[in-house]
C-alpha cells in the first residue's frame, strides 16, 4: 500500500499542487512514444518488459512527458485528457484504490459503513472488508466502467495487500487472492489490462491473472528479484523508487528488465529516468 501515501499529500501538502508541474530538467525523456501493434478483436493491451512509463497522481497533468505509458488518477483525469494522450501514441493506466476507502472520492458515500475498517495510516483512508465481495463488486464495477468510458487501456488497482496489514478484519491470504482475482476479472471483462500492485507474496499465484506489475521501492528493500515471474512471463514491471537516486538502482533494474524511474513521494509530474 505504499502508493496510497502519495494521495494523502493532496490534503497535507496542498502547496505541492501549486508548484510547476512539468517533467523538469531531470527528465531525460528517453522513452519516446512509439507505434503500438494493432490489437485483434477481443485482445487487450500487454506491455512488455522494459516499457517506459510516467506516473502522475497529483497536480495538473503534464501531457508533454516523453513516455509511452501514462499511469494517472482515474477520477481526476478527464476523458479529454485521455484522448490527448492516446492521440499522441501513449497508452493510459487508470489509477484506483480498490482495497481501501477514501473519503475524498465522489462515490465515498456509496460504501456502507460496516465495510470500512481501520485507517491505513493516512487521513481519510480506511481498509475495506474485501471478504464482502457481493457488496464491493458493484461498487468497483462502477469505477471500472468509468475507466473504460474515459478510454483507458488498463487499470492500476491500489491497496491490494490488506491481509498483510492491521485492517480491522480477520483477512486471510485466501481472501486476498479471491478479491484480487475479482479485480482482475472486472478489468478484463471490460477489455482493459490490469496490474498487480505490490503484494509480492502472492505473485506466484497471481502472475497469470494480471498483465503487468506496479511496484514501489523494491530496490530500496532488496525485493526486485521477487518480481521476476512477471518478466519471465513477458509482462512489464513498472517500478518506482523515491529515496534512492538512479545511480543506485538503474544498472540492476536494466539487467532485470524492469521499467524503473525515480519519483517524488507526491507523485507529481517530475520523474528521473534511467540513463
PLM segments and residue spans:
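Glycan-processing catalytic domains of CAZymes
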Residues: 29-275
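Bacterial N-terminal signal peptides that target proteins for export
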Residues: 1-10
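Compositionally biased low-complexity segments, especially N-terminal hydrophobic helices
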Residues: 9-14, 27-30
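Residue-level signal for mature regions of secreted extracellular proteins and peptides
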Residues: 14-15, 267
Amino acid at each position: 500500500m505504499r502508493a496510497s501515501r502519495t494521495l494523502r499529500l493532496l490534503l497535507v501538502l496542498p502547496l505541492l499542487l501549486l508548484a510547476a508541474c512539468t517533467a523538469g530538467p531531470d527528465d531525460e525523456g528517453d522513452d519516446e512514444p512509439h507505434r503500438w501493434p494493432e490489437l485483434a478483436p477481443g485482445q487487450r493491451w500487454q506491455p512488455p518488459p522494459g516499457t517506459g512509463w510516467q506516473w502522475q497522481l497529483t497536480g495538473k497533468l503534464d501531457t508533454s512527458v516523453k513516455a509511452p505509458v501514462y499511469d494517472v488518477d482515474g477520477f481526476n483525469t478527464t476523458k479529454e485528457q485521455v484522448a490527448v494522450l492516446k492521440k499522441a501514441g501513449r497508452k493510459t493506466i487508470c489509477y484506483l484504490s480498490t482495497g481501501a476507502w477514501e473519503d475524498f472520492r465522489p462515490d465515498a458515500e456509496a460504501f456502507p459503513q460496516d465495510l470500512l475498517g481501520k485507517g491505513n495510516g493516512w487521513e481519510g483512508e480506511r481498509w475495506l472488508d474485501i471478504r464482502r465481495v457481493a457488496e464491493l463488486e458493484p461498487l468497483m464495477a462502477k469505477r471500472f466502467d468509468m475507466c473504460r468510458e474515459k478510454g483507458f487501456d488498463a487499470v492500476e488497482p491500489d491497496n491490494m495487500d490488506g491481509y498483510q496489514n492491521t485492517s480491522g478484519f480477520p483477512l486471510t491470504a485466501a481472501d486476498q487472492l479471491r478479491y484480487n482475482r475479482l479485480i482482475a476479472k472486472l478489468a478484463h471483462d471490460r477489455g482493459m489490462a490490469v496490474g498487480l500492485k505490490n503484494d509480492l507474496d502472492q505473485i506466484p499465484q497471481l502472475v497469470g491473472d494480471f498483465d503487468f506489475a506496479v511496484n514501489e521501492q523494491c530496490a530500496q528493500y532488496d525485493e526486485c528479484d521477487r518480481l521476476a515471474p512477471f518478466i519471465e512471463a513477458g509482462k512489464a514491471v513498472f517500478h518506482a523508487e523515491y529515496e534512492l537516486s538512479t545511480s543506485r538502482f538503474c544498472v540492476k533494474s536494466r539487467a532485470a528488465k524492469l521499467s524503473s524511474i525515480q519519483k517524488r513521494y507526491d507523485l507529481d509530474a517530475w520523474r528521473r529516468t534511467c540513463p
